[in-house]
């Protein structure tokens, strides 16, 4: 999916919501545990209920890898289900990969060739040669970690060099030498507030993947005020606040209702 297609889908749905599939078998409704594949059964129901209100899904690989082979199978089935039934949805593999060139090339092959996923999150710490293998696939996206929503982001990302440039700003500037706004996005946590204003001075045209709305307390209004650009430029993720909004047999219906609430907020902002 290219940038124009993504923007057109945002306009059509009046939404830039991404539903995070951080599926924990300890948190899904008990009645699903009787299913042959409880994780996939949960994901399928969530996807069917939320698809009208979102433009992307973001399975977090850690939740699937922690279950070994069964978890990876559930992940593959989830990706296939989205692609077959909701082909307009942008799929993000939240894997946070990043290693030396040969290893990164294998990661890229996994997500872009074997699974044909639209995008993957990548850690930039090891530099250009750890990122470029992901950039060799036409129509695929790298989503580079820039300024995250966790408290530990202060440990490194907000530290300044002798010129007063913060590390996340250096990541933004340097990585523009490797790619452009047609194949690279950045992760910026919703809890970072006014930092979006500084980020847009460096990357005015790139899409930003924004986790931290909902359970982590980020403000959608603040993110949009400082982060939105002429093509929207935002994919705002919500995971727990949607997928775990209810633990009864009505969990999917409630998840759909929560996604619809967020979509309505987004539509209001887009129409201002």
From Swiss-Prot:
Membrane-spanning segments: none
InterPro entries cross-referenced by the UniProt entry: Aldolase_TIM, OMPdecase_type-2, OMPdeCOase_dom, RibuloseP-bd_barrel
Presence of the UniProt keyword Phosphoprotein in the record: no
EC number: 4.1.1.23
Coiled-coil residue windows: none
GO molecular function, one term: orotidine-5'-phosphate decarboxylase activity
GO-annotated biological processes: 'de novo' pyrimidine nucleobase biosynthetic process; 'de novo' UMP biosynthetic process
Residues annotated as catalytic: 96 (proton donor)
Alphabetical UniProt keywords: Decarboxylase, Lyase, Pyrimidine biosynthesis
SMART domains: OMPdecase (SM00934)
Catalytic activity: orotidine 5'-phosphate + H(+) = UMP + CO2
Pfam families in the record: OMPdecase (PF00215)
Top-tier EC class: lyase
CDD domains the record matches: OMP_decarboxylase_like (cd04725)
Pathway annotation: Pyrimidine metabolism; UMP biosynthesis via de novo pathway; UMP from orotate: step 2/2
Similarity comment: family membership: Belongs to the OMP decarboxylase family. Type 2 subfamily.
Protein name: Orotidine 5'-phosphate decarboxylase
